[in-house]
Swiss-Prot record:
This is Potassium voltage-gated channel subfamily KQT member 2. KCNQ2/KCNQ3 heteromeric current can be increased by intracellular cyclic AMP, an effect that depends on phosphorylation of Ser-52 in the N-terminal region. Residues 609-618 have a biased composition (Basic and acidic residues). Belongs to the potassium channel family. KQT (TC 1.A.1.15) subfamily. Kv7.2/KCNQ2 sub-subfamily. It comes from the Eukaryota. The modification Phosphoserine is found at residues 52, 438, 440, 444, 448, 450, 479, 681. Pfam families: Ion_trans, KCNQ2_u3, KCNQ_channel.
């Protein structure tokens, strides 16, 4: 009989023969060959079992023991009790106030127990109150140890021991053990022994110390002392020197005559009590030398002994102010953030800007689309109930059963399969708007194995963003079509393919959003200004200093701009190095680059003459300045050249004619001088006025003299310019009369000067 084995082999089998098995050696745990290397690599030994992610052995099977499951309520209670006892806030202070009143009552009763009138009544109440205090403190101590397990560093028995070694926990256990020992050994029929009461008074002090569980008082004191350690050490050192010196000198002066200063220790006691301004009066100097020394060192030493109190007081005040300052500045955080957000929306919602879209997209998501434009009136109530849970996404209602979760169409597919999504994808073409997909087509696309879903890339996101948007005209068209009666409404009642998508914001809605953003910006700005109110005097000083620096910078900028317009640039600019005011390369008054400063224009400050400036070799080659100051400089140069020519002609005339100065002075006194032209320094205007007045006097005096003997020359029309003739030609034309010759010449000069001034 041939039998086929389980492993596929064929061998003759007998009833008494042992069945052979083909396999690996040492796979069974506990087998003799299971300690081989190959066996350990294939199956592993029995001891190290497969662990979880946290390297803990998995507990599988029915017989395996399950670890104790921590309840959520257990953890919550542990955290709650730990916060109440270690970090009290809010109503948790009620318990700590109760403990404080309990300890304070024990302290008051222990004080009354020392008075004979109230000794008996206070001892009984103190006994009961001490028992209550011990019970409360004992329960609180064990609850603290148990609740500390909520912190990871205090978990386990080692963590509990670490928590118990904290200073305040050590004080708690000391007070608890000592109180139990005093009550057990010192009580005799509800009456305390004297030694027990004394020990109990000491325990009251420790109980008051434990009231500050967080140690904030001691931390504050330590920080103040550390911050002002140098000042304190200096004051204590000088005060100690004054104490030693004053005690020693008074001891030498009072040693033989005063019994209170028999030893140097008595003198040190007197010096300490005196310099600390306590003055018990048990010891005092009696000799005049001792009194004089005591008065001198008292005036010096008291000031140094009082310094530490002032240093610590100011240090505490500054530390408290530093602790309150961050709290005051934290109040400015929310107004500042709101101001930044509202300022950006105020900037981004500007209708003239077309490059900012994120803010408008935010409002497109938040603003509700009117439902009555998209929903037929017959299905409005039912769809409104269904659309409450749909926040602006595509919604379809089909008369087919709801598909399973695995067959549900994704948001992306629903958007692109919708007619408006296809319209957005087809860029508004009429062919794309008329295309509609049936649910069967969508299902066939989803079920086809050849279609592999692609990742939703940024391009898809942009396409879905376009698909989510629908123009207001399309929405109004849908509302009009929905309002028309006919067969379409009946078909929509049977199968409503309604879609809910967001629409673009209309211009009116954008204007409304813009107005709201402006109002929010103004309100946020006002709130932020209110939060910037000064906290203390230091804030006021800082604000004034910042404003002063800002004002100085603005004034400096304004001055530099004025100098750039009407004068040379300030020394800090590189333009001043290019055109220096002194040296061989400085521009002269005739150069187009020259322009007077503001003080020179208004007539203040020393005038800069041509002697102070040296003409450069390249002045004539410089291009003309087209600015206002360049043109004014050019006009001034022309006027100066004309003044030089006129001065030359007048000097020749006066020398040739020999006009007496008495006549000119008499005429000058009878005629007021004309005012000086504007935009000139006082020296230039004075010189110009003198020259002009002199010319007028000479001209009018000569013309009046010539009119006595000769007639006036024929008038020349103003449009024509007189011919340029020399002085000899005019002398030969008018004969031998010198006055007439000079009068005609000066008249021509006067007319030519008037025409040039008109030009």
């Amino acid at each position: 009989m041939v039998q086929k084995s389980r492993n596929g082999g064929v061998y003759p089998g007998t009833s008494g023969e042992k069945k052979l098995k083909v396999g690996f050696v040492g796979l069974d745990p506990g087998a003799p060959d299971s300690t081989r290397d190959g066996a350990l690599l294939i199956a592993g030994s029995e001891a190290p079992k497969r662990g979880s992610v946290l390297s803990k052995p998995r507990t599988g099977g029915a017989g395996a023991g399950k670890p104790p499951k921590r309840n959520a309520f257990y953890r919550k209670l542990q955290n709650f009790l730990y916060n109440v006892l270690e970090r009290p806030r809010g109503w948790a202070f009620i318990y700590h106030a109760y403990v404080f009143l309990l300890v304070f009552s024990c302290l008051v009763l222990s004080v009354f127990s020392t008075i004979k009138e109230y000794e008996k009544s206070s001892e009984g109440a103190l006994y009961i109150l001490e028992i209550v205090t011990i019970v409360v403190f004992g329960v609180e101590y064990f609850v603290r140890i148990w609740a500390a397990g909520c912190c990871c560093r205090y978990r386990g028995w080692r963590g509990r021991l670490k928590f118990a070694r904290k200073p305040f926990c050590v004080i708690d256990i000391m007070v608890l053990i000592a109180s139990i020992a005093v009550l057990a050994a010192g009580s005799q029929g509800n009456v305390f022994a004297t030694s027990a009461l004394r020990s109990l008074r000491f325990l009251q002090i420790l109980r008051m110390i434990r009231m500050d569980r967080r140690g904030g008082t001691w931390k504050l004191l330590g920080s103040v002392v550390y911050a002002h350690s140098k000042e304190l050490v200096t004051a204590w050192y000088i005060g100690f020197l004054c104490l030693i010196l004053a005690s020693f000198l008074v001891y030498l002066a009072e040693k033989g005559e005063n019994d209170h200063f028999d030893t140097y220790a008595d003198a040190l006691w007197w010096g300490l009590i005196t310099l600390t301004t306590i003055g018990y009066g048990d010891k005092y100097p009696q000799t005049w030398n001792g009194r004089l020394l005591a008065a001198t060192f008292t005036l010096i030493g008291v000031s140094f002994f009082a310094l530490p109190a002032g240093i610590l007081g100011s240090g505490f005040a500054l530390k408290v102010q530093e602790q309150h300052r961050p709290k005051h500045f934290e109040k400015r955080r929310n107004p500042a953030a709101g101001l930044i957000q509202s300022a950006w929306r105020f900037y981004a919602t500007n209708l003239s800007r077309t490059d900012l879209h994120s803010t408008w997209q935010y409002y497109e998501r938040t603003v509700t689309v009117p439902m009555y434009r998209l929903i037929p009136p017959l299905n409005q109530l039912e769809l409104l109930r269904n659309l409450k849970s749909k926040s602006g996404l595509t919604f379809r209602k089909e008369p087919q059963p709801e598909p399973s979760p695995s067959q549900k169409v994704s948001l992306k597919d629903r958007v692109f399969s919708s007619p408006r999504g296809m319209a957005a994808k087809g860029k508004g073409s009429p062919q794309a708007q008329t295309v509609r997909r049936s649910p069967s087509a969508d299902q066939s696309l989803d079920d086809s194995p050849s279609k592999v879903p692609k990742s939703w890339s940024f391009g898809d996101r942009s396409r879905t963003r376009q698909a989510f948007r629908i123009k207001g005209a399309a929405s109004r068209q849908n509302s009009e079509e929905a309002s028309l009666p006919g067969e379409d409404i009946v078909e929509d009642n049977k199968s409503c393919n309604c879609e809910f998508v967001t629409e673009d914001l209309t211009p009116g809605l954008k204007v409304s959003i813009r107005a709201v953003c402006v109002m929010r910006f103004l309100v946020s700005k006002r709130k932020f200004k209110e939060s910037l109110r000064p906290y203390d005097v230091m804030d006021v000083i800082e604000q004034y200093s910042a404003g002063h620096l800002d004002m100085l910078s603005r004034i400096k900028s304004l001055q530099s701009r004025i100098d750039m317009i009407v004068g040379p640039p300030p020394p800090s600019t590189p333009r001043d190095k290019k055109y220096p005011t002194k040296g061989p390369t400085a521009p002269s008054r005739e150069s187009p680059q020259y322009s007077p400063r503001v003080d020179h224009i208004v007539g203040r400050g020393p005038t800069i003459t041509d002697k102070d400036r040296t003409k450069g070799p390249a002045e004539t080659e410089l291009p003309e300045d087209p600015s206002m100051m360049g043109r004014l400089g050019k006009v001034e140069k022309q006027v100066l050249s004309m003044e030089k020519k006129l001065d030359f002609l007048v000097s020749i005339y006066t020398q040739r004619m020999g006009i007496p100065p008495a006549e000119t002075e008499a005429y000058f006194g009878a005629k007021e001088p004309e005012p000086a032209p504007p935009y000139h320094s006082p020296e230039d205007s004075r010189d110009h006025a003198d020259k002009h007045g002199c010319i007028i006097k000479i001209v009018r005096s000569t013309s009046s003299t010539g009119q006595r003997n000769y007639a006036a020359p024929p008038a020349i029309p103003p449009a024509q310019c007189p011919p340029s003739t020399s002085w000899q030609q005019s002398h030969q034309r008018h004969g031998t009369s010198p006055v007439g010759d000079h009068g005609s010449l000066v008249l021509r000069l006067e007319r030519s000067a008037g025409m040039m001034s008109c030009h």
